[in-house]
């Protein structure tokens, strides 16, 4: 027998080290992981056998068996699924084979208490065996191949792979050599209870050997949970199915179990998690809804079954209208699949709209977890933009709570027809921004956008129900025109730029190319100045993001808006009228301050510091 000794990838070594030294209390999840893997192996072979029946010749009844050998301190899990050859064993058990495991590693903090919690939250498949075993032996024979291979490791950095001449039928057998301190898992009654807890939803029959090791007892009904009537399924069964499917420790927030019997027949059992998934925004993240055709698993990869902005969904979709022998390539642009996708999207958005109205506090928690992903749909070429906007909520600057666009519109001031927003990284900083002080002083609400995606979707969706959605950084905002014409108006704020031409020209001459235009502001009430952009220009935060991503080279010159009611600006204006033009340093300082408040870089930090020091010195001397 030829035996090869190999080292684990460094990443796998880290996971194994965590498993071996784990203090995680719910170690029984190793059975969930191994049973799920065995079920997947059977599903894969069932799918492949549709086009090649020889793969299951003589053994077409899939099953999983679990056996306890107390004398040898072993738990043995056996399946007759797809099996693995030598290369499969090395790739699947010796290296990082899935992005989820790599993402798990990135989430490790170094704090053993926190890291042990991650085990239960994310699931790490086969490697969880080493929480209870000090040695694991895997024997496997791949369907359609004759060779048998054995993989073995103690989890301490190395593993061996060898050929074997033992008699072994198709599939995989995993033998866990249980640690002395984990004796409870050798208790027949306890292990049977654990297996039954995790297996009831599994579509493959699972058999448990009695204590004598002779008779097999079937533990599960071996019928897919989603095929059963809802009236026969308990809440606990739904929860356990969700946890097994998604490797989660939380309970689902929403469960959607529906049978569609219209033009397209399909069943969906979908869940929205109650906790944020660690890899929600990872570029390699797979959508985790599995496609079945007539109870046969087809794929959960490279199929457009749900839109990417609903990638937080977990569950299964089982279609009656797709042929079992369909190729995965044919699924890429399939009209039936597209109709299923549209129906699911409509159903999910409908559930979210209902929750938003009935349980606003719960919905706020959902939004904090998944709102950023959901808003990505507003950037896509889809007919669902308005339905998506209906379920979006945003922070209200006026009321300091999350509100919908419909709530915002319902609270319009008399004469108002525009939805105003301000985008930035921190809601507290946005609340103190000069950009919105005039609007808030007139009780005109402003929505605070703090997700990066917000700056993108507003470029695609400039209106909602015929109301313009406008950034508060735009130059043409006139607070007085926005509110009721019956309100008393401050004549200073409505003076034309012509009346202050001496002032605006002086600022422009002093600042030169640093600014595009200098205007009198119709939205400032107390601050001396602010940056602004025209309606046709790119939003300030969006431009900054694209510069950071090296999509554009340089920032464009912005407009500078002045507040003639501010004492500093008033002094400069009065000096100019007295032919005193010695305020260049103060003008530059006002511009630098406007840049800082907007998150823009100061052109010359050294000069800014000197100006500030000079003004402070004049004030105290």
Swiss-Prot record:
Keyword ATP-binding: yes
InterPro entries listed in its UniProt record: HATPase_C_sf, Heat_shock_protein_90_CS, HSP90_C, Hsp90_fam, Hsp90_N, Ribosomal_Su5_D2-typ_SF
Record keyword Transport present: no
GO cellular component: cytoplasm
SUPFAM superfamilies in the cross-refs: ATPase domain of HSP90 chaperone/DNA topoisomerase II/histidine kinase, HSP90 C-terminal domain, Ribosomal protein S5 domain 2-like
Assigned keywords, A-Z: ATP-binding, Chaperone, Cytoplasm, Nucleotide-binding, Stress response
Pfam (any one): HSP90
Annotated stretches, region: A: 1-328
Gene Ontology MF term list: ATP binding; ATP hydrolysis activity; ATP-dependent protein folding chaperone; unfolded protein binding
Gene3D superfamilies in the cross-refs: 3.30.230.80, 3.40.50.11260, Heat shock protein 90, C-terminal domain, Histidine kinase-like ATPase, C-terminal domain
Residues covered by region (Disordered): 475-496
Sequence ranges of Basic and acidic residues compositional bias: 486-496
Region feature C, mapped onto this chain: 545-621
Protein role: Molecular chaperone. Has ATPase activity.
Record-stated family: Belongs to the heat shock protein 90 family.
Designated name of the protein: Chaperone protein HtpG
Lineage: Bacteria, Pseudomonadati, Pseudomonadota, Alphaproteobacteria, Rickettsiales
């Amino acid at each position: 027998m030829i035996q090869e000794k190999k080292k684990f990838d460094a990443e796998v070594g880290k996971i194994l080290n965590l498993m071996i030294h784990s203090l995680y209390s719910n170690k029984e999840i190793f059975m969930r992981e191994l049973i799920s893997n065995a079920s997947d192996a059977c599903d894969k072979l069932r799918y492949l056998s549709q086009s090649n029946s020889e793969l299951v010749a003589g053994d077409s009844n899939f099953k999983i068996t679990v056996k306890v050998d107390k004398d040898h301190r072993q738990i043995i899990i056996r399946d007759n699924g797809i099996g693995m050859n030598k290369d499969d064993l090395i790739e699947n058990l010796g290296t990082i084979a899935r992005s989820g495991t790599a993402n798990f590693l990135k989430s490790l903090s170094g704090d053993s208490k926190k890291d042990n919690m991650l085990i239960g939250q994310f699931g790490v498949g086969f490697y969880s065996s080493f929480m209870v075993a000090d040695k694991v032996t895997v024997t496997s024979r791949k369907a359609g191949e004759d060779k048998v291979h054995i993989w073995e490791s103690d989890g301490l950095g190395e593993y061996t792979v060898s050929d074997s001449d033992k008699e072994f039928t198709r599939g995989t057998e995993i033998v866990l050599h249980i640690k002395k301190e984990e004796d409870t898992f050798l208790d027949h009654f306890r292990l049977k209870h654990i297996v039954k807890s995790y297996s009831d939803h599994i579509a493959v029959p699972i058999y448990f050997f009695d204590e004598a090791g002779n008779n097999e007892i079937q533990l599960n009904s071996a019928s897919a949970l989603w095929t059963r009537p809802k009236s026969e399924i308990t809440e606990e069964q739904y929860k356990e199915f969700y946890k097994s499917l998604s490797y989660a420790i939380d309970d689902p927030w929403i469960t959607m179990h529906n049978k569609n019997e219209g033009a397209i027949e399909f069943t969906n059992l979908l869940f929205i998690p109650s906790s944020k998934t660690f890899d929600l925004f990872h570029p390699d993240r797979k959508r985790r809804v599995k496609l079945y055709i007539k109870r046969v698993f087809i794929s959960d990869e490279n199929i457009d079954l749900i839109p990417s902005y609903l990638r937080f969904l977990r569950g299964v979709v089982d279609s009656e209208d797709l042929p079992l022998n369909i190729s995965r390539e044919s699924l890429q642009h399939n009209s039936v699949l597209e109709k299923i996708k549209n129906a699911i999207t409509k159903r999910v958005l409908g559930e979210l709209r209902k929750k938003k109205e009935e349980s606003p506090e719960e919905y706020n928690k959902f939004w904090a977890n998944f709102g950023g992903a959901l808003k990505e749909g507003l950037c896509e070429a889809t007919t669902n933009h308005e339905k998506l906007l209906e379920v979006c909520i945003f922070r209200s600057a006026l009321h300091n709570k999350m509100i919908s666009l419909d709530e915002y519109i319902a609270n319009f001031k008399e004469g108002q027809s525009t939805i105003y927003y301000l985008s930035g990284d921190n809601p507290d900083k946005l609340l103190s921004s000069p950009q919105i002080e005039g609007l808030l002083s007139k009780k005109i609400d402003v929505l605070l956008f703090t997700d990066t995606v917000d700056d993108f979707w507003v470029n695609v969706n400039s209106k909602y129900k015929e109301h313009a959605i406008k950034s508060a950084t735009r130059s043409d905002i006139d607070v007085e025109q926005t509110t009721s014409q019956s309100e008393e108006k401050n004549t200073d704020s409505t003076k034309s730029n012509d009346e202050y031409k001496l002032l605006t020209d002086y600022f422009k001459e002093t600042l030169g190319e640093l600014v595009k235009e200098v205007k009198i502001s119709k939205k400032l009430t107390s601050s001396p100045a602010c940056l602004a952009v025209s309606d046709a220009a790119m939003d300030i935060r969006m431009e900054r993001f694209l510069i950071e991503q090296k999509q554009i080279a340089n920032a464009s010159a912005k407009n500078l808006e002045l507040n003639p009611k501010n004492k500093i600006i008033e002094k400069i204006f009065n000096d100019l009228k007295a032919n005193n033009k010695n305020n260049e340093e103060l003008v530059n300082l006002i511009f630098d301050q406007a840049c800082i408040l907007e998150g823009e870089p100061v052109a010359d930090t050294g000069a800014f510091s000197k100006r500030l020091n000079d003004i402070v010195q004049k004030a105290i001397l």
